[in-house]
Amino acid sequence: MNPGDEMKEYEMQVITFGAKCSPASAQYVKNRNALEFKESYPDAVNAIIKNHYVDDLVHCFSSEESAVRVVKEIVDIHKKGGFELRKFVSNSKFFNKVFGNEQVAEPITLDRDESSHYQKVLGMYLCTRSDEFGFSLSFNKIDASIFSESRIPSKREVLRVVMSVFDPFGILAEYSLIAKLLLQSIWQRRTGWDQPIEGDDIKQWKCWLRSLSQACKIRIPRCYAEEVFGEPIELHIFCDASESAYAGVGYWRIRSKSGWKSAFIMGKTKCAPMKLSTIPRLELQAAVLGTRLRKCILEGHDVNPKCVHMWSDSKTVLAWIKSDHRKYKPYVGHRIDEILEATRLEDWHWVPTKDNPADFGTKLRSGTRETSWLRGPQFLQEDASQWNLGTSDVGDTELELRSKFTLLINEMSSDGSVNIVFRELLERFSSFTRLMRVVAWVYRMCDRKIKRKVYLDVADIEEAVLIVIRNVQDVAFHDERVALLTGQCIEKNR
């Protein structure tokens, strides 16, 4: 192309798949097109903006009639913008009949006997017959010899398999924790990307592989409760920590005609930092995780709970939260500040470890114990008057207190003529150079305006010399200095 030629302008008529700007452009156009129908189709517009995930629409309704009405409006809005929404799937036969077989999504094989009843929803699978979410863990692109345990995988292959398990709500938290701790151990060993794992990591890897077959059997109801919108609802967040991990998990507590019911919302597990930390600090980090989980749940739901309860089995953490956080060290103080910005003091309660479901997200899974991670603690299904959780004595509030430093400066002798601190420095150091360096370091610590450096420079030493000279003059000419400061005359013979 000749630089002197006139520039030619090209305009794209459609969004190009794969361009860096494509996701943002697609979302903007989708929302902008929907907003033009805000007055005529308010429910449909709200669904398009809030319930669209790229090109997938995931929504739920309280009745079949409202579902058909809103979806028809959504289809109409997209059609006027040049988009075609199709491949619907629902647990309602009436809904599927209205939209016809040609618009219903093709079945995805999950189980040989019930393959036609399973549909993929954002990485998970929905069984339309039982209205439950499940998992199908397929690793078709990964060498089969890894799963047959005939070959030890490399670090890269382990990471690839672990990241293939998509669990956005933490349903498989007890299983994913094994994988997270395995990856942490591999990193600590400094294993190369293409080097086979070794030692105890092999045993833990095989244990995790075998547990995946149990994970595929997990099912969780899509709907929290049929009467969730008609009765008062409560949000309960539990948090816990151990030496190896910390976790948070949330549940709805719903009152129905048959009594109280708890429904799993989501959970989160994280490995403890490789740098050693105390259990109270990890428990505090779990409380921060629970606070962030609370915010995520409230922002992601249209339901406004009647009350929110935060539960921890650490009496020390509860004591920190309910005391003045400014007296604690920065690590504790900053995290308590984040907790109190999003929660109230009265929201926090103590729960025994045996009744804390978050405990199951902090320890390696054991096939012999019954888990309450998905169903919640038993006491949530009882009336609050029957809760017998024991007493929560105040924990140790002396931990993590800021150290109190007392700096004694400018202490004078009884006659006021000698600075005691300076005199001790003169008597302690016989080397002038060493004395100057000590004075420079002390002055830097006292003056917070000075930018902290890891070394002394010439300016610091010169300032130290002036300080020493002033103090020597103050000792040798104390009376004259006092007279000048008070405006008195000095005798000529002095």
Annotate each PLM feature:
Residues 6-29, 158, 254-285, 323:
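A short, polar/acidic, helix/strand-boundary loop motif
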Residues 11, 48, 78, 114-229, ...:
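C-terminal reverse transcriptase regions that engage the nucleic-acid substrate
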Residues 51, 92, 289-353, 357, ...:
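RNase H catalytic domain
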Residues 1-10, 25-39, 127-144, 150-152, ...:
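Reverse-transcriptase-like RNA-dependent polymerase core
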Residues 46-81, 93-102, 316-329:
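Catalytic palm subdomain of template-directed nucleic-acid polymerases
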Residues 99-163, 340-356, 360-494:
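Flexible, low-complexity interdomain linkers flanking nucleic-acid-processing modules
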Residues 233, 237-263:
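Acidic, metal-ligating active-site segments
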Residues 23-69, 73, 292-310:
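Active-site palm subdomain of RNA-directed nucleic acid polymerases
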